[in-house]
Amino acid sequence: MTCKIIGCGGYLPSKIVSNDELAKFVETNDEWIRTRSGISQRHIADDNEYTSHLALKSAEQAIADARVSANDVDLIITCTTTSDNSFPSVATKLHGYLGLTNIPSFDLQAVCAGFVYGLQVADSLIASGKYKTILLIGAEKMTSLLDWNDRSTCVLFGDGAGSVILQRSSDDSGLIDSNIFSSGADYEILYTSGGISMNGTSGKIIMQGQKLFRHAIEKMQQSIEDLLHTNQFSVSGIDYFIPHQANIRIINKLAELLNIEEHKVVKTVEKHANCSAASIPLALSTLKASGKIKKGDILLFSAIGAGLTWGSALIRW
């Protein structure tokens, strides 16, 4: 018994900031950003537009795409590291926005790997038989964590949300398998300078870029190869590779090492920047909207985030 995706949705704030616009108040330029990240623009939420608002927009799209009612949802999981409030959770606020009754809702925090983590958790809960229809969301307002004087980080992130509706599969479609990992020893590679119990602030993003690049390649490659081997899949059997959209150099290097053909690699980082837990569901929503995915296609997700946390998932559409 496994879960399958029956609907997708994605939302990006209307405000777009290009590299050239960013260079007006950050010591950088378009060539420098593109060369190092592949990013040309990012979407930035307004001050009064919160993570829960982004989540709601994407959730409404996913519900419509799945052709179900919001009242059919019996569990909400929101993957985010940028909650509106310390409490309650974004998922619970979304529960209220959707006007739902007493179904459970909670947030899951695994940063950029959040959606892959959430997918495994949701699959386990559906397999338990307790839940039939789960709304799984990746939503982030990453720009709220940026130090706009640090050009090594502030140019890399954007805001957005992506959602999927999951139900139990009655055929061979759905989640084939997934794996998730963490390494707390690598905490200082990517973290924020603050937190509620530390200093009562959200802090700003601090990143050791070169170390993170090496770990991303090594850990995502190993995760993918282990997943394919365990499930007796070959790389040639993958129809679409949807990696976390952090950096075009990481995406391209992974595809090269894994020998995944260029036309199979989904890339949205140029226009979306790094939307953390939202990046994979946003990319999936973009791919589905293009009409390219067909029934039976094999999709491969993989992500790495702060913690470090990482993992991969195989899905038959």
Swiss-Prot record:
Region (ACP-binding): 245-249
Matching InterPro entries: ACP_syn_III_C, ACP_syn_III_N, FabH, Thiolase-like
Localization in the cell: Cytoplasm
Record pathway: Lipid metabolism; fatty acid biosynthesis
Disulfide feature: none
Statement: the UniProt record of this protein carries the keyword Transmembrane helix: no
Enzyme class: transferase
Chemical reaction(s) catalysed: malonyl-[ACP] + acetyl-CoA + H(+) = 3-oxobutanoyl-[ACP] + CO2 + CoA
Record-listed E.C. numbers: 2.3.1.180
Protein's job: Catalyzes the condensation reaction of fatty acid synthesis by the addition to an acyl acceptor of two carbons from malonyl-ACP. Catalyzes the first condensation reaction which initiates fatty acid synthesis and may therefore play a role in governing the total rate of fatty acid production. Possesses both acetoacetyl-ACP synthase and acetyl transacylase activities. Its substrate specificity determines the biosynthesis of branched-chain and/or straight-chain of fatty acids.
Entry protein name: Beta-ketoacyl-[acyl-carrier-protein] synthase III
